[in-house]
Amino acid sequence: MFSTFGSVPILTVVAIQLFLIRNVLSLNLTNAYLHHKCNNTQGIYKRGSAFEKNLNIALRTVIFNGDFRTGFRYGDVGEDPNTVFVMYQCRGDSYWSNCRTCVTTALSGLRKRCPGNKGAIIWYDQCLFEISTVDSYHKIDYENDFYLSNPKNVSNRELFNRETSALLEKLTTKATDKKNIDGANQLVLYAAGEKRIGTKKVYAMVQCTKDLVFTTCSSCLEWIFRMYSDCCDGKQGGRVLGTSCNFRYELYPFLRN
């Protein structure tokens, strides 16, 4: 069972944008834009439509009434065929004010890149944000993924691949531990760690969206690990990002302590 957004006054587009502009000024410069997808199959909404009104209610709730302590929110507004589903997930080290800043930036970026789309996803370094007409709660999204990698290669490819994969598998076990819960009694579904490989130290993380359970999180991570060879074979750094889960590793620290 998931929480739905309550009935609140509709936020005008102008008010949203003014709020976004103020918050973008405090953006952490490491929070880079990564990728987006405008889902044209879900259609385009019209100005003043019931869908737009529901969307504005959802966005108002996310930005002004959102609880960013756990870094995750999923909810819906309206009745079919104008139901709006909204979801954000912040990186495991980017909760509270860092999460709010990233979500605010992501919302602004989504409006600019996918204006009028009923379905769209945007990824930033510290969060992802999605609007949709489809209820995806507890479900793995197998359709939306991409990868990024460092163009530089390591010297011992086979050893590096083997040890990095082992680290990611270890982190998956930790992230999907049923005892790994946060202050809100939610599964954390996130883990980070490091490992020395020869003279190098590898830093890594894995994460799933908090609507998943430990079994589906494990399945999602196993799925994106299959893309390791395409993304990251012998590379000094790489990541695969989906809507439901992601992993990343680098030869330098990239997370907050």
From Swiss-Prot:
The keyword Repeat applies. Keywords: Repeat, Secreted, Signal. InterPro entries: CRR_secretory_protein, GNK2, GNK2_sf. GO terms for cellular component: extracellular region. Residues 32-136, 142-254 form the Gnk2-homologous domain. It is found in: Secreted. Its main location: secreted. CDD domains: Gnk2-like. Residues 1-26 form the signal peptide. PROSITE patterns: GNK2. Gene3D superfamilies: Gnk2 domain, C-X8-C-X2-C motif. Belongs to the cysteine-rich repeat secretory protein family. This is Putative cysteine-rich repeat secretory protein 28. It comes from Arabidopsis thaliana. The gene is CRRSP28.
